[in-house]
A protein has these predicted regions:
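Conserved N-terminal Rossmann-fold NAD(P) cofactor-binding segment
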Residues: 1-19, 26, 31-35
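A generic structural signal for alpha->beta connector loops
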Residues: 4-6, 84, 107, 134
Length: 258
């Protein structure tokens, strides 16, 4: 792009906003400790299992209560310092945060974003043994709950190939704990995530479309997978309870190494 970016750091937020055409937020208010830990520990005492707990449920509610006031402070600064900027908002709980921002500061141009659309497209391409650059898709829905209405392999000499029939072969086999067969020669048997996506492949079997959000997220968005006294569902669908805690520990170690 022939760009020569200059990266600077600031301890004053308003100073960092001066002259901005775009603003991006990726923050975790309260940090991993103590806030996120508490979001998991207290519900666990009452038998409530969570995987990510940043979008809905008790964890999502508490995160929203911590986060919305901070985002509204940022919104106020944007209005005063760079009112024409486009705000790219990545902080969860996304829907609650965006409702608060849009209701309080409707003049601000802002959009709530997540990496899940492009990330899942790459995952599905890998599961199928295809290159992502050969894939064409149409995704519809809301943040953290969108579906691929179309997932196709591009063709230069005819109509695109609908890849859903091949994805449904994978779905039938992994959900039923069958060994991935050679019924489709292009199934990628070595995909490292495929056996940990049973929730989403089950949803594909039931609804006919693949959802963008990860299996660990989706498992706590709907009432079908994490249930009281139904531990066998967690085992069957390989649902990683407390997954976000493990991720935070992992990334904290990486940061400490840096």
């Amino acid at each position: 792009l022939d760009a020569s970016p200059k990266i600077t750091s600031h301890t004053d937020r308003r100073e960092s906003l001066v002259g901005s055409d775009f603003v991006q937020t990726t923050i975790q208010v309260g940090g991993y400790k103590p806030s996120t830990i508490i979001d998991f520990e207290i519900p666990r005492q009452y038998g409530l299992k969570q995987t990510i707990a940043d979008t809905l449920g008790i964890g999502g509610i508490m995160r929203g209560l911590r986060t919305i006031p901070v985002l509204l402070d940022i919104a106020k600064d944007i209005m005063e310092v760079c009112p024409k900027a486009l705000w790219l908002q990545y902080v969860n709980p996304m829907c609650a945060n965006m409702i608060a921002i849009n209701n309080s500061f409707p003049e601000i141009k802002t959009v709530g974003l997540c990496h899940s659309v492009q990330g899942t497209a790459e995952m599905l391409a890998k599961d199928l043994g295809e290159k992502i650059e050969d894939i064409e898709y149409l995704c519809v829905g809301i943040n953290h709950m969108a579906f691929y209405k179309k997932f196709e392999k591009k063709s230069n000499d005819g109509p695109n190939e609908d890849l859903y029939p091949r994805l449904k072969i994978i779905a039938d086999e992994i959900v039923n704990d069958e060994k991935l067969s050679s019924r489709s020669e292009k199934i990628n048997h070595e995909s490292d995530k495929i056996l940990h996506e049973k929730v989403r492949y089950e949803i594909l079997r039931r609804f006919g479309y693949f959802v963008t959000e990860s299996s660990e997220h989706f498992a706590e968005y709907v009432p079908w997978f994490i249930k009281p006294n139904k531990e066998e569902l967690i085992e069957k669908y390989k649902i990683p309870v407390d997954e976000y805690i493990f991720r935070c520990e992992y990334y904290s170690e990486l940061w400490n190494e840096l």
